[in-house]
A protein has these predicted regions:
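Central regulatory/effector-binding core of bacterial HTH transcription factors
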Residues: 2-65
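Short beta-strand->loop
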Residues: 5-11, 111-117, 190
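Secondary-structure junction motif
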Residues: 15-21, 64, 108-132
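A late-sequence structural motif
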Residues: 26, 174-217
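Hydrophobic hinge/microswitch elements
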Residues: 39, 48-53, 58, 118-174
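Short hydrophobic/charged patches on amphipathic alpha-helices used for structural packing
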Residues: 44, 48, 78, 104, ...
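Flexible hinge/capping segments at coil-to-helix
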Residues: 71-73, 77-86, 90-112
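Beta-alpha-beta core module
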Residues: 73-79, 84, 149-194
Length: 217
């Protein structure tokens, strides 16, 4: 099925909210859009093939070189819109939830929940900052709802983008700054030389506004 506008993105709530804001702002009696949660490779593939016009992703100061090379090889370019610092998402009842900041060492005894990228995915493709660090307890999942439920049920944690819109997930989760020397760069993928227009341009403008509003350091 052909869509009037389609976006693919990593598993972030600010993607969903930006898409919803765009649809509401445009209105109309009829429309045919698509929003796709994907792995990092899935986002790349969707934009490269034209399945989606844009792909919302992030890279870090540590992964930028590898990701930019992968984007370039696929005929894509990354447009940075904002920067943020990583934060740890924990259950509201977690014993470390009131810390002023946390290190990965302090979290070593707790299950680490993350998004599965596939067994052959490069470390740079993880959706969590410092996702390549070894953990004694880790669980991979493929959707946002399962990730949130597992964090709460197992008293676990994940590392978020630092964009706090929607992260509370019904007040079950809280975030604490992660003590790490890494910066997150958030933006979108497009085909080289392409310029978003129409609905895509509205989406990008709304995305930039949301990122600037909710980014935390």
């Amino acid at each position: 099925m052909a869509y009037d506008f389609s976006v693919s993105g990593q598993h972030y709530l600010f993607n969903v909210q930006t898409f919803a804001h765009t649809v509401l702002a445009l209105g109309g009696d009829s429309y045919n859009y698509a929003f796709r949660d994907r792995t990092t490779q899935g986002v790349i593939d969707d934009v490269a093939s034209g399945e989606s016009e844009l792909g919302v992703v992030f890279e870090t100061s540590a992964t930028a070189a590898d990701l930019d090379a992968a984007f370039d090889a696929a005929g894509l370019e990354f447009v940075q819109l904002a920067e943020s610092a990583p934060r740890v998402a924990l259950p509201a009842s977690h014993p470390l939830v009131n810390a002023s900041s946390l290190t990965l060492e302090q979290l070593a005894d707790y299950p680490y929940i993350y998004f599965d990228q596939g067994k052959d995915a490069p470390a740079a493709f993880f959706e969590e900052a410092l996702g390549d660090q070894p953990c004694a307890k880790s669980i991979a999942t493929t959707d946002r709802a399962s990730l949130s439920e597992l964090i709460v049920a197992l008293n676990g944690y994940t590392v978020t983008s630092g964009i706090l819109v929607g992260i509370s997930d019904g007040a079950q989760l809280r975030t604490v700054p992660l003590d790490a020397d890494v910066t997150l760069r958030l933006g979108y993928l497009k085909k080289k030389g392409a310029q978003p227009d129409g609905t895509a341009a509205r989406f990008v403008a709304t995305l930039e506004k949301n990122l600037e509003r909710y980014a935390k350091f």
